[in-house]
C-alpha cells in the first residue's frame, strides 16, 4: 500500500497535538546535500600534525535530521532548503515513510550543481500510516509527523453536515 503525503507550507497546516519529548531528538548525520567541502574534509588532505587546530568535530560541522525517539510517535525534521516544494515527494509505503527530493542541474556560486536524495524511515509500532502529515517551513525545514492510532481514535470527530 502506498499513500502520497502532500508537502504543504507550515502556515497552512492545522495545529496538531504536541509531541511529548520533542525537545530531545535523536540525530542523523550527513544531511549536507551538495553544499561543498568542510574544513574537516579539506584537512584530510594535509597531515593533522601540521595544523591540528583547523579540525572541527564532524558532529558540530554537519547539519542533522532530527528524529525524536518517543515510542508511538513519529516526527522527522529535514533541512531541504535547496529544494522547492514541487521537487520534494513524501509518501508512506507499508510501514515506512519515504522522502525523495531532486532538482536538475542549475547554476550556483561554484558552477553548476544537481542534487538528489532519498530517505526512508520506519514508522514505530502503533502509529497510523494514514495520519502522516508533512509541512515545509519558509526556512526550508521539512517536518513530517504522525500520531499514534490510539490518539487518532480519542480525537473528537467533526460534526456531521446537515
UniProtKB/Swiss-Prot annotation:
Homodimer. Small heat shock proteins form high molecular mass oligomers containing variable number of monomers; these oligomers display a very flexible quaternary structure easily exchanging their subunits. Heterooligomer with HSPB1; formed through oligomerization of HSPB1:HSBP6 dimers; subunit exchange leads to formation of at least two different heterooligomeric complexes, differing in variable quantities of HSPB1 and HSPB6 homodimers in addition to HSPB1:HSPB6 heterodimers. Keywords: Chaperone, Cytoplasm, Isopeptide bond, Nucleus, Phosphoprotein, Secreted, Stress response. Widely expressed. High expression in muscle tissues. Gene3D superfamilies: 2.60.40.790. It comes from Rattus norvegicus. One of its GO terms (biological process) is protein refolding. One of its GO terms (molecular function) is protein homodimerization activity. This is Heat shock protein beta-6. Its main location: cytoplasm. There is a cross-link at residue 31 (Isoglutamyl lysine isopeptide (Gln-Lys) (interchain with K-162)). Pfam families: Crystallin, HSP20. Belongs to the small heat shock protein (HSP20) family. Residues 56-162 form the sHSP domain. The modification Deamidated glutamine is found at residue 66. The modification Phosphoserine is found at residues 16, 157. It is found in: Cytoplasm; Nucleus; Secreted. GO terms for cellular component: cytoplasm; cytosol; extracellular region; mitochondrion; nuclear speck; nucleus. There is a cross-link at residue 162 (Isoglutamyl lysine isopeptide (Lys-Gln) (interchain with Q-31)). The keyword Secreted applies. The gene is Hspb6. Changing residue 31 to E: Abolished transglutamination. Small heat shock protein which functions as a molecular chaperone probably maintaining denatured proteins in a folding-competent state. Seems to have versatile functions in various biological processes. Plays a role in regulating muscle function such as smooth muscle vasorelaxation and cardiac myocyte contractility. May regulate myocardial angiogenesis implicating KDR. Overexpression mediates cardioprotection and angiogenesis after induced damage. Stabilizes monomeric YWHAZ thereby supporting YWHAZ chaperone-like activity. Residues 1-72 are annotated as: Involved in stabilization of the HSPB1:HSBP6 heterodimer. The N-terminus is blocked.
Amino acid at each position: 500500500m502506498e499513500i502520497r503525503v502532500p508537502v504543504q507550507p507550515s502556515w497552512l497546516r492545522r495545529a496538531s497535538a504536541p509531541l511529548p519529548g520533542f525537545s530531545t531528538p535523536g540525530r542523523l548525520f550527513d544531511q549536507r546535500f551538495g553544499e561543498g567541502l568542510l574544513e574537516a574534509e579539506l584537512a584530510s588532505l594535509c597531515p593533522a600534525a601540521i595544523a591540528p587546530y583547523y579540525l572541527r568535530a564532524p558532529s558540530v560541522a554537519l547539519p542533522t535530521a532530527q528524529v525524536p525517539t518517543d515510542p508511538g510517535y513519529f516526527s522527522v525534521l529535514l533541512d531541504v532548503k535547496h529544494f522547492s516544494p514541487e521537487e520534494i515527494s513524501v509518501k508512506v509505503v507499508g510501514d515506512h515513510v519515504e522522502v525523495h527530493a531532486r532538482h536538475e542541474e542549475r547554476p550556483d556560486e561554484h558552477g553548476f550543481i544537481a542534487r538528489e536524495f532519498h530517505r526512508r524511515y520506519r514508522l514505530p509500532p502503533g502509529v497510523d500510516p494514514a495520519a502522516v502529515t508533512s509541512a515545509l517551513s519558509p526556512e526550508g525545514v521539512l517536518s513530517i509527523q504522525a500520531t499514534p492510532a490510539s490518539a487518532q481514535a480519542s480525537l473528537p470527530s467533526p460534526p456531521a453536515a446537515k
